[in-house]
Design a protein with these regions (language model features):
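Hydrophobic beta-strand positions
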Residues: 18-19, 69, 197
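AMP-binding/adenylate-forming catalytic core of the ANL superfamily
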Residues: 39, 44-45, 67-175, 179, ...
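Active-site loops of AMP-binding adenylate-forming
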Residues: 1-6, 21-22, 49-52, 131
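Gly/Ser/Thr-rich phosphate-binding loop
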Residues: 1-3, 16, 108
């Protein structure tokens, strides 16, 4: 059997493949980790970018950044991006792309979102809101983003979008509740190629986003920052 629904099929010779943990240690069949490949058709590195090459290609092995596992039947399953993993305080890992795509896909009030958890007490979300749609919704209630009452209404609306996936919500059970965001930050600008927060394929560059908003991420793990009506959220909706 060369293929099975949901898999990428079997390895094509002479390509070599292994699954590794965050320390580069090879994992046994069935365990999920980073997909690492080697072979004559695998790229040798990045053009005129030795730093990225050193991070990605080691001893001829290409660390793809993809998350997956090999089944006992020798079938490869790709499950997301390895470097985007949420990591809970007890070390459990989860790929956030499905949640992020669902939030953006079902909500007209969320343009972009990135989830974050790096061995932290809870998961947080960085949200780029769709201010135009929020303003249209608010207009029916004679509210605007020009005053605090209106901004609090918009923040509450964003919270309701996140809560649709929690217990009692429209999409309850779609994702494990422990990985859903407990709080969120409203960002002042979108992720773009110009600010290098998305790449040419329109994928988020998580490292850049985390670096740019490191202070804000830390703030969300404080008692003040965990409150959705914190001053930073109110200011970023102006």
């Amino acid at each position: 059997e060369k293929y099975r629904f949901g898999s990428s099929g079997k390895l094509v010779k002479p390509l070599e493949l292994k699954i590794c943990d965050a320390d580069g240690k090879e994992l046994p069949l069935g365990e999920m980790g980073e997909i690492v490949v080697k072979g004559e058709n695998v790229m040798a590195g990045y053009w005129k970018n030795p730093e990225s090459t050193a991070d990605t290609v080691k001893d001829g092995w290409l660390y793809t950044g993809d998350l997956g596992y090999m089944s006992k039947e020798g079938l490869l399953y790709v499950k997301g991006r390895f470097k985007s993993l949420l990591i809970s305080s007890d070390g459990e890992k989860y790929s956030p792309e499905g949640i992020e795509e669902a939030l953006v896909g079902q909500s007209k009030y969320i343009d972009q979102v990135m989830l974050y958890n790096n061995q932290s007490p809870y998961t947080i979300a960085l949200i780029v809101p769709n201010k135009d749609n929020l303003k249209r919704k608010m207009a029916f209630k004679n509210l605007t983003l020009e005053n605090e009452e209106g901004r609090k209404y918009a923040i509450k609306k964003l919270e309701k979008e996140l809560n649709k996936y929690k217990k009692g919500g429209d999409f309850e059970g779609m994702f494990p509740e422990r990985w859903l965001p407990s709080t969120f930050a409203v960002l002042p600008e979108p992720f773009t190629e110009q600010n290098q927060m998305i790449n040419s394929t329109m994928k988020m560059v998580r490292g850049k986003i985390e670096k740019a908003y490191a202070g804000l991420i830390d703030y969300l793990y404080t008692p003040e920052g965990k409150q959705i009506y914190n001053q930073k959220n109110l200011d970023n909706l102006k």
